Amino acid sequence: MFHLINFQLPLIFSLLIVLVAAKILGEVAERFGQPSMIGEVVAGMILGPSLLNVIQNTAELKVLAELGVFLLIVMAGLEIEVEEIRNSIRGKNIWIALLGFIIPFIGGALTGYAFHFNNTFSIILGLCIAITALPVSIRILMDMGKLNTEVGQKIISAAIFNDIVSLLVLGVILDFNDESKRLSDIVYSSAFTIGKIVLFMFILIVAYRLFKLVKSKMRIVNPKVNDFLHYLRGKESLFALVIVFVLIFSSIAEAMGLHFIIGAFFGAILLPRTIFAKGDFKKVKESTSGITMGFLAPVFFATLGIAIDVTSLGNLPLLLMVLAVSFFTKIFGGYFGGRFAGLDRSTSFTIGLGLNARGIMELVIANIALQRGFIDVSVFSILVIMALLTTIFTPFFLQCGFNVIERNSPRPNIHSS
């Protein structure tokens, strides 16, 4: 077997092959109306031990993948504003957000227990199944021209809620004791972590209040901020300042024993948009997207594919059960949430179909669980395949749901005077 790792510059050659393969297959996926991450993960599977075995997950590639995780989470946070978080839990929308998360979470956890896995694994399985990928959902709905419809907005609101809750639950899971067998052990081992999360949320609330105070003084603050930004001569200085801002919150999270992505996500959300001059915030997002989607994200998704070992997928019953539970519990959660919110059956069912899009956040959490030793390669492989398959089929089923809504919607009477 030919191994590129034997070359004098293994990182450069490995990176070249990984990036080229990931971008080519990512482009192929885009041509078929799928997120590029699907092609990028498949590229890793082809290059890794599943097929060609020419690339290994070296320490250097893992460092680049970690940077990719950081910037992917920052990108997700930059797409969310505090007001959107309020909208996701405002009024009857809370039913869709809650049941769209809780029912799949319970279904996934019960699946883990049914297969005699420990508490930590079962809860991680439930968490990965419960997530709806915000960027993937936005992309699918935009391609369908349904982003600004009632169904589209409720799916996005639920996805925002899911992303936030999933990271908070992750913070608790990372301190679980694997040897715990009783519920009381889990509660006691998690109490300190929950306290840290509450403290971190308090810091976020204080920061948000300070930013609101600054916003109320915009006539005084804005000119000074703009003068400072114009004073900077270095290229992409504004982008660097944004990264520093987010890193501060990531560092706070790490110092408190939480994972850095929790701080990165909430730091990006709290970033005050109003202090930017017209067009500057868009430039920051474009800079972040360029380095992330053009370089680091493909490397991250490819490393996930490299980590998959298809030969380790010996537990076919678990794979089939995870696929079934992940698909149907999301439908049930969205359906019952929609019904409690006062929506009709077809609209509620379509929301449940739309909540099945998974991707970035679920893959990030699965990767963290693998690194921490909470799950093995076979389970990790099942979670990645589940994310890919549910995401691939979601656009087709969602379009069917929209077609049902259109057929059931009242048509104007063209003969009426």
How would you label these PLM feature ranges?
Residues H3-I17, T58-M75, N119-L134, T193-F202, ...:
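Structural signature of hydrophobic alpha-helical transmembrane segments
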Residues A76-I80, I103-G108, I129-L170, T329-G337, ...:
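Short helical (or helix-break) motifs at transmembrane helix termini and adjacent helical loops
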Residues F7-K23, E81-A114, N119, R182-I203, ...:
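Entry/N-cap segments of selected transmembrane alpha helices
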Residues L47-K92, V225-V322:
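Membrane-interface junctions of multi-pass transporters
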Residues I24-I38, A114, I248-G263:
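Flexible hinge motifs at transmembrane-helix junctions and intramembrane kinks/re-entrant loops
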Residues L15-L16, I164, G171-I275, G279, ...:
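Core mid-bundle transmembrane helix pairs that form the ion/substrate translocation pathway
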Residues I55, A59, N87-L99, F117-I129, ...:
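The feature identifies polytopic integral membrane transport proteins across all domains of life
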Residues L19-F32, M75-S88, S137-K146, Y208-R219, ...:
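C-terminal ends of transmembrane helices
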